[in-house]
């Protein structure tokens, strides 16, 4: 997709709409600011899958300026969100997804309804309600930045944030506002639990919480419980002085049943374990036993739904290009069977997205070409410089992927670009 007309489409939504039933569309998006209110599927979508790959997360931006604040009460979260994900098994990489409304009330940037979504190396930016999850869905976020001020990760479902940056904007507020868990756990069934009931929901592991300049000490809470049967948990996370000593805020009595947990929180200033002696009485410090037994995405995703969600396998992607052959007029390479396409760079800049395993060039062309593989789910490998490539062994994967009738190596690749 490219707004300047150099791609197959100028709008992301048009590229999504072009994906046929029974296939996955891998949509490559060139840098630009796309103000579209994008829908990756609808409630009726059952057999279409989407991967959105941005060229660079800092410059490839899906944006919205719509809010549900004063004067806009008729708007819904769907109207506000720059991206609404209804299709299952959605994948996004190298994108900024934002709402620029500011401190005017609810204004989502991202809403996910489809199950088994993955966001890799993305930025979610807003003020209030930046990211809205949904009960019944599982999601995995890795190496992402999520920023906001009020309840900016909220609602139900089973969402896991690994090695992410959680950024607190100037002012004060709450990181999370969890709602219905959808999977209550009891000590009878899960004996390592430290409480009689546990409501898993929003999990943050190995995340770093940072604060903007001017945020006062103690101005933020880890969260507040929107509903009673809800949960949020911070595992091995670095916390700044901006986090209030109480950790968690009460909300109309919901806190007495909610599962608001921490495990080995770290003081970002010292690198030592954080002082949790003044934490709210309704919150919990998890035990080693329950964290080891239950508090990991593999276990919880499998318990939440029977349908497999192997996020680790998906994120491994395809093998990087290998076994390059360079002649005066052509560069060719190999990958494994999990590669759906390739991104070619010329002197470090994007040149094209292709399903071919070769590039024709002029004999006098002395540019440096590098190639990255794109997996069937849309995961981009490290780019390999053709002139420096070493011969390495490919390890094909058995994972299936529907082929598109017009050709290519599995799936339909749609190039999307912008200014």
Region roles according to the model:
Residues 1-17, 389-419:
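Right-handed parallel beta-helix/beta-solenoid
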């Amino acid at each position: 997709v490219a707004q300047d007309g150099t791609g197959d489409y100028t709008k992301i939504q048009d590229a999504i709409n072009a994906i046929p039933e029974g296939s996955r569309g891998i949509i490559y998006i060139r840098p630009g600011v796309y103000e579209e209110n994008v829908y990756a599927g609808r409630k009726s979508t059952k057999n279409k899958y989407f991967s959105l790959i941005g060229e660079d997360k800092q410059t490839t931006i899906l944006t919205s300026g719509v809010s549900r604040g004063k004067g806009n009460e008729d708007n819904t979260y769907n109207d506000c969100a720059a991206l609404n994900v209804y299709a299952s098994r959605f994948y996004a990489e190298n994108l900024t997804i934002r709402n620029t409304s500011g401190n005017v009330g609810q204004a989502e940037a991202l809403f996910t309804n489809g199950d088994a979504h993955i966001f890799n190396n993305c930025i979610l930016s807003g003020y209030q309600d930046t990211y809205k999850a949904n009960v019944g869905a599982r999601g995995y976020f890795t190496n992402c930045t999520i920023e906001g001020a009020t309840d900016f990760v909220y609602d139900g479902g089973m969402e896991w944030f690994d090695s992410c940056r959680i950024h607190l904007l100037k002012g004060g507020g709450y990181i999370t506002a969890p709602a219905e868990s959808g999977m209550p756990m009891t000590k009878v069934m899960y004996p390592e639990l430290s409480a009689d009931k546990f409501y898993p929901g929003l999990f943050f592991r190995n995340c770093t919480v940072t604060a903007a300049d001017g945020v006062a000490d103690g101005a933020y809470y880890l969260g507040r419980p929107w509903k009673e049967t809800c949960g949020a948990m911070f595992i091995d996370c670095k916390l700044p002085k901006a986090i209030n000593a109480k950790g968690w805020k009460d909300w109309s009595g919901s806190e007495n049943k909610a599962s608001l947990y921490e495990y080995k929180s770290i003081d970002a200033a010292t690198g030592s374990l954080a002082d949790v002696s003044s934490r709210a009485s309704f919150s919990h410090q998890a035990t080693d036993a329950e964290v080891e037994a239950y508090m990991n995405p593999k276990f919880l995703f499998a318990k939440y739904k029977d349908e497999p969600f192997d996020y680790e396998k998906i994120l491994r992607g395809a093998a990087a290009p290998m076994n390059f052959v360079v002649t005066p007029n052509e560069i060719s390479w190999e990958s494994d069977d999990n590669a759906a396409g390739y991104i070619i760079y010329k002197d470090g800049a994007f040149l094209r997205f292709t399903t071919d395993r070769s590039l024709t060039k002029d004999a006098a062309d002395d540019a440096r070409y590098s190639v990255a593989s794109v997996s069937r789910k849309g995961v981009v490998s490290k780019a390999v410089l053709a002139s420096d490539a070493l011969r390495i062994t490919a390890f094909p994967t058995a994972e299936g992927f529907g082929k598109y009738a017009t050709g290519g190596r599995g799936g339909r690749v749609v190039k999307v670009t912008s200014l």
